Amino acid sequence: TNAWPNHSSMFGIIDLASIPKDRYYLYRSVWNKKAETLHILPHWTWPGREGKVTPVFVYTNHPTAELFINGKSYGKQSKNNSSLKNRYRLMWIDAVYEPGEIKVVAYNKDGKAVAEKIVRTAGKPHHIELVSNRNELTADGKDLAYITVKVVDKDGNLCPADSRQINFLSLIHI
């Protein structure tokens, strides 16, 4: 598209920087049998939505999961073949937003809890985190690493609505 900052299509499961979008985890949960997938969406920072219904979706390779919002269970959901939307994701359509944390506990086919993920409401932006996909580089002038920049609150929670542009200056001349 010609819309800044997009320089390509807004479609696909991975963006131009190789960062997975939410839909990526749907495919991973179905196709990747070796790595565990437990992905919650949306984020849980919604100022002004307090008390409003905010559906929660989970992509997982486990058959069942339970949603907790600030410790209150919203029940277990299991994948089923009644429709395409129920086959590949778990949904809590009646979840009500309140700041705090959402936790998902995933269960295997025997009903045993096998995975857990927590997403917390972010506070005010505090600092940036730089995360590299590699720990070492070959000093040959050709090797590279991808650095992901995250704006986080004082507790390290991602601030999803912070849209400030961050500029970097490299002092290394090759």
Question: What is each model feature region?
Answer:
Residues 46-51, 136-145:
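Short, solvent-exposed loop/linker segments at the N-terminal edge
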Residues 112-122:
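Edge beta-strands of extracellular beta-sandwich domains
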Residues 163-170:
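Short acidic, flexible loop segments centered on an aromatic residue
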Residues 172-174:
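Conserved small/polar residues in nucleotide/adenosyl-binding loops
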